[in-house]
Curated annotation (Swiss-Prot):
One of its GO terms (cellular component) is chloroplast thylakoid membrane. NDH shuttles electrons from NAD(P)H:plastoquinone, via FMN and iron-sulfur (Fe-S) centers, to quinones in the photosynthetic chain and possibly in a chloroplast respiratory chain. The immediate electron acceptor for the enzyme in this species is believed to be plastoquinone. Couples the redox reaction to proton translocation, and thus conserves the redox energy in a proton gradient. InterPro entries: NADH_UbQ_OxRdtase_su1/FPO (IPR001694), NADH_UbQ_OxRdtase_su1_CS (IPR018086). Its main location: plastid. The keyword Cell wall biogenesis/degradation does not apply. It is found in: Plastid, Chloroplast thylakoid membrane. This is NAD(P)H-quinone oxidoreductase subunit 1, chloroplastic. It comes from Chara vulgaris (Common stonewort). It is a multi-pass membrane protein.
């Protein structure tokens, strides 16, 4: 029994011990991971926003937020509360229903993507065998939400921003998918957990970044474009389109777009870690034999096993998040150091450079796998 299944079983048993019926306890066990996922996602966004403000301040030789909490850590929460209490304005000539459903279609696929992200060994909400395929399919819904948001606003800037967002997402989703398929072909699996497991044998030397360097570079650039980060933030270029498809949005709906942007950056970084940087695996190959024997000297067997069950998941999650925020650091650094490119340059980069690179990388990976199959 995995640690996650055991934790769920113990939680149900604990709720039943408090006098709650089994049916209600089972419902709680179903919805609790969903609530936990939402809370963790929001916390991840708050940390990412704070990091971006501090890093951008350092790049521009400023101090950044410092008064709202220690080191300005509460500034993102204050801004979020401010957005929640602002008036939600709907354009008089716009489509009210589509205007409201646009942000939902943008943020929902991003949140659902976290279901198949392994934060540690057996620490995953839904370990389906088609995890990579699920992420690719669910992320393809986001451009539809952006296009609907731009169309429903009945504003020329919003419509142009929505069209740009859809064109950009389609252009860069294809090379991104081909890079993911190369990793899947190399690992002979579509499961995110299995992909990480295959990168643990020799430590950092087993990571897929060494076997797929071209794929990693292509994935990094395409993921930045998918997240609409500078230098690829053409759909909301202030000098050209005011705020793009977000122009007519305010209050909580604008906040949903804002949160979705950072959630997308976070989930893209997590998948980069899972696919290329070994996931929860430590860079140096280690074994737990010495760790277990050290604690067995002074602790009973049950106590040492219980301690390991508590410590190992924490270590796995910490390693995954450390790699993720390292990836986010470079994404933030790119935003504040590179100039915005033109829309024609954006599409040329996607179709004329990244797509051929991704196709060539996939063909080389397939040839390599066929050669190994012939000699095995």
């Amino acid at each position: 029994m995995s640690s996650l299944v055991r934790l769920k079983f113990n939680a149900i048993k604990l709720v039943i011990d408090f006098g709650i019926s089994e049916n209600i306890a089972y419902l709680i066990s179903i919805f609790l991971p969903i609530v936990l996922l939402l809370v963790i996602s929001v916390l991840g966004v708050l940390v990412t926003v704070w990091l971006e403000r501090k890093i951008s301040a350092a790049v521009q030789q400023r101090i950044g937020p410092e008064y709202a909490g220690s080191l300005g850590i509460m500034q993102a929460i204050v801004d979020g509360v401010k957005l929640l209490i602002k008036e939600d304005i709907i354009p008089a000539q716009g489509d009210r229903w589509l205007f409201s459903i646009g942000p939902v279609l943008v943020v929902t696929p991003v949140i659902l993507s976290y279901l198949v992200v392994p934060f540690g060994k057996n620490i995953i909400l839904s370990d389906i065998r088609l995890g990579i395929f699920f992420w690719i399919v669910i992320s393809s819904i986001t451009p539809l939400g952006l296009l609907i948001a731009g169309y429903a606003s009945n504003n020329k800037y919003s419509l142009l921003g929505g069209l740009r967002a859809a064109a950009q997402s389609i252009s860069y989703e294809i090379p991104l998918t081909l890079c993911v398929l190369s990793i899947s072909l190399l690992s002979n699996t579509l499961s995110t957990s299995d992909i990480v497991e295959q990168q643990c044998k020799y430590g950092i030397l087993s990571w897929n970044i060494w076997r797929q360097p071209v794929g990693f570079i292509t994935f990094f650039i395409a993921s930045l474009a998918e997240c609409e980060r500078l230098p690829f933030d053409l759909p909301e270029a202030e000098e050209e389109l005011v705020a793009g498809y977000q122009t007519e949005y305010s209050g909580i709906k604008f906040g949903i777009f804002y949160v979705a942007s950072y959630l997308n950056l976070l989930v893209s970084s997590l998948f980069a870690v899972v696919l290329y940087l070994g996931g929860w695996n430590f860079p140096i190959p280690t074994t737990l034999i010495f760790f277990i024997s050290m604690y067995k000297v002074s602790l009973p067997l049950d106590s040492s096993n219980l301690l390991l069950e508590l410590i190992i998941p924490i270590i796995h999650i910490s390693i995954t998040l450390a790699k993720t925020y390292l990836f986010i650091f470079f994404a933030i650094l790119a935003r504040w150091t590179l100039p915005r490119i033109r829309i024609d340059q954006l599409l040329d980069l996607g179709w004329k450079f990244l797509l051929p690179m991704a196709v060539g990388n996939l063909l080389l990976t397939a040839s390599f796998q066929l050669t190994l199959f012939e000699f095995s």
